Regions:
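Lipid interaction determinants
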Residues: 1-145
Length: 145
């Protein structure tokens, strides 16, 4: 079985945190973040993560929100898609980002270390600086269907 067939499918976010080297966790989209991740066997992916407590726009028009509504919603979600490749031997996935709500991600390759256990997929980022210390992003997904 190749790596793509192992992870292909639809996944629901269970938890998302940044774990700092001191062991403390930060929840960038709250402790009850929601998300969807889809991998196809053809090598495409789509990922969306967001806070559950984002404020609704008062007038119901997404193009007419107040600056505060727009800021809270933008800071409360991430969405990106593109192609991907899997290296099962070394335990990582590369997301080739084609488009993202955060334009600085576009054209980048995002490495994620993965562990697949039953119907759970854990993705971890390489270490990065967060608030002056090393941290790792940890996302736990559950396969749907």
């Amino acid at each position: 079985m190749n790596g793509k067939s192992q992870i292909a499918g639809a996944w629901k976010l269970i938890t998302f945190e940044f774990r700092k080297e001191d062991g403390n966790a930060i929840y960038p989209y709250g402790e009850k973040a929601q998300g969807s991740l889809i991998y196809t066997e053809a090598g495409r992916y789509s990922a969306q993560l967001m806070r559950v407590d984002r404020p609704k726009f008062a007038i119901g028009d997404q193009m007419q929100g107040t600056p505060e509504e727009i800021e809270a919603n933008y800071k409360g979600c991430v969405s990106y898609f593109g192609s991907y490749e899997v290296n099962p031997k070394n335990g990582y996935i590369i997301h080739h980002v084609e488009a993202s709500i955060f334009p600085n991600m576009e054209g980048t390759d995002q490495k994620r270390f993965f562990e697949l256990t039953g119907n759970r997929l854990q993705l971890k980022t390489p270490p990065f600086k967060l608030e002056g210390v090393k941290a790792v992003g940890i996302l736990l997904w559950e396969r749907l269907g």
